[in-house]
Amino acid sequence: MLLDDRKLKILQAIIDDYIYSAEPVGSRTIAKKHELGLSSATIRNEMADLEEMGLLEQPYTSAGRIPSDRGYRLYVDQLMKIDELNECEIEKIRSDMNIRINELSQLIRSASAVMAKITKYTSMAVSPHMKKSVLKSVQVVPIESGKALVIIVTDANIVRNNLIRIPESVTPAFLIQISNMLNEQLKGFTLEMLKSDILNEKFEKLTALPFRLIKPILDGIEELIITIDNPEVYLEGATNILNFPEFKEVDKAKEFLNILDEKKLVSDLLTNSVNDNNEIIIHIGNENAMEGIKDCSLVTASYSVGNHVIGTIGIIGPTRMEYSRVVSSMNYIRNKINQEILKLLDNG
């Protein structure tokens, strides 16, 4: 959509003012606050044109104008200036994310918390998708007679464990022997390669030990791999939405909070909102497919191991969002996550 310079400046002034005030913006306000060199009457005529073009709306007669979803889209794509984070905000992010972290899920949880704190919106994050992760080590640790703990560690230092039942005749020495064999044979495999038929075939051929003693351990590994492939969802600041006048109606706020309670919905929302170009993605209002968030904007970014996207972080709030602030915060935090992932890998 092509707009002349005058219309663009007026649209930007209206959106900037509305984001700050949450009140419809009138032509006199624009004429007084912004040095556009235009009369109130001229601005009013331009606002009428912008409304006709679908970029502004008038919530009620005699009110000023507010941006439509299309207006916000044009603002984000063409007019928004990305603010740099100030030193205080940067230090806050660094201090919150520089705590001793030795596991990737812990890092993502920490990042989600700091995003909500910095932006004052609701933050969401999905823990890493681990199909492509490489197995670094396997341990089978005796717990008590008839029980053992299978522990696997990936190349991204993600640790998972599973309590399994084993024959009571199995000794700790046998479990050490099995652990050594598992590491020798499985280290370096990606998790998606470790299916039950591969595991069974590999160990039936490789060992003279009774397969009935090994089978519960292999089953335990497969169960762990299945759970790893069901990523966790982290939410912070869910009730922040109640601080915005757009959500003062109880039913509207309730619908939003109910969606956040559905972890599968949130996971799908984030997973479906990324691309392969490592860009920050912004979905505004009706651009969101989910009915309960059509009055919201969703901003998402992916984080990576090397060139592989393994997870997503996001911010959700009203369409009257401080987009510049959110984008700058998310970009910094996403880069920080990627840096910390490299540290975890180097230390692993």
UniProtKB/Swiss-Prot annotation:
One of its GO terms (biological process) is negative regulation of DNA-templated transcription. Keywords: Repressor, Stress response, Transcription, Transcription regulation. Coiled coil: none annotated. One of its GO terms (molecular function) is DNA binding. It holds the Pfam family HrcA_DNA-bdg. It comes from the Bacteria. The keyword Cytoplasm does not apply. Belongs to the HrcA family. PANTHER family: HEAT-INDUCIBLE TRANSCRIPTION REPRESSOR HRCA (PTHR34824:SF1). Negative regulator of class I heat shock genes (grpE-dnaK-dnaJ and groELS operons). Prevents heat-shock induction of these operons. This is Heat-inducible transcription repressor HrcA. The gene is hrcA.
